């Protein structure tokens, strides 16, 4: 089971790197990424702006710390510690990748074609750390808590919602968040100390 987790983790990490390379280094990648970004970033009105502005914060380390505190208070300290540590690991990995791959944010690359809903973050656009942090947290927590399929599907939907919000709000390209999702999943698969269950 541990070997399988390592293979899956490495494969997911390679997938994240492949998406980033395709978006940055191929002829068609930037154009496709830009078109998808424009489609999602177009906006759906003030209600959607406010809702997704709140949803996106669920991918922050602060939100992970708050969720871990809630788990610890409820007596699930192992799950809290493992999930928060994995989320922190995903954040550190993402920040390290940003130093290696410097990609301008959408607004920097196209100021007049980007609808900014929130303040522009600093640093490279690739990869997106918010989905990486949340995905690492939710997957490790789900294994530690032995959550069922329905709960895991709900958490996966939350991961994707946060990832999509980053594009909608104008701070990341689709390939940035796709890589972030895979990066978070890779960290979760490789994270030691989790009760490893299939599914």
Where do the protein language model's features map onto the residues?
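N-terminal transmembrane-helix/juxtamembrane module of multi-pass inner/ER membrane proteins
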Residues: 1-63, 95-123
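Interfacial segments of alpha-helical transmembrane regions
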Residues: 4, 69-93
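Short, aromatic-rich membrane-interface segments at the entry and exit
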Residues: 8, 78-84, 149-153, 174-175
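Alpha-helical transmembrane spans of integral membrane proteins, capturing the lipid-embedded, hydrophobic core
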Residues: 10, 14, 83, 87-91, ...
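Short hydrophobic alpha-helical membrane-entry/anchor segments
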Residues: 17-30, 72-77, 94-103, 143-146, ...
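Membrane-helix interface segments
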Residues: 47-48, 76-79, 107, 147-151
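Small-polar-interrupted transmembrane alpha-helices in polytopic inner-membrane proteins
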Residues: 85-101, 151-165
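Membrane-embedded catalytic cores of phosphoryl/pyrophosphoryl-handling enzymes
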Residues: 111-199
């Amino acid at each position: 089971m541990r070997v399988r987790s390592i293979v899956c983790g490495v494969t997911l990490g390679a997938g994240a790197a492949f998406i980033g390379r395709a978006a940055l280094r191929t002829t068609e990648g930037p154009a496709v990424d830009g078109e998808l970004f424009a489609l999602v970033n177009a906006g759906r009105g003030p209600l959607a702006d406010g809702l997704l502005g709140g949803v996106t914060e669920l991918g922050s380390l602060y939100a992970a710390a708050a969720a871990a505190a809630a788990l610890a208070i409820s007596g699930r300290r192992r799950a809290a510690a493992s999930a928060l540590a994995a989320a922190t690991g995903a954040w550190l990995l993402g920040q390290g990748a940003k130093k290696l791959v410097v990609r301008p944010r959408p607004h920097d690359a196209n100021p007049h074609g980007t609808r900014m809903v929130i303040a522009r973050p600093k640093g490279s656009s690739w990869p997106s750390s918010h989905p990486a942090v949340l995905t690492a947290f939710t997957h490790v927590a789900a294994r530690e808590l032995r959550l069922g399929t329905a709960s895991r599907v709900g958490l996966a939907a939350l991961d994707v919602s946060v990832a999509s919000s980053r594009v909608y709000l104008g701070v990341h390209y689709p390939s940035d968040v796709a890589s972030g999702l895979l990066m978070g999943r890779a960290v979760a698969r490789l994270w030691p100390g989790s009760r490893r269950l299939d599914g």
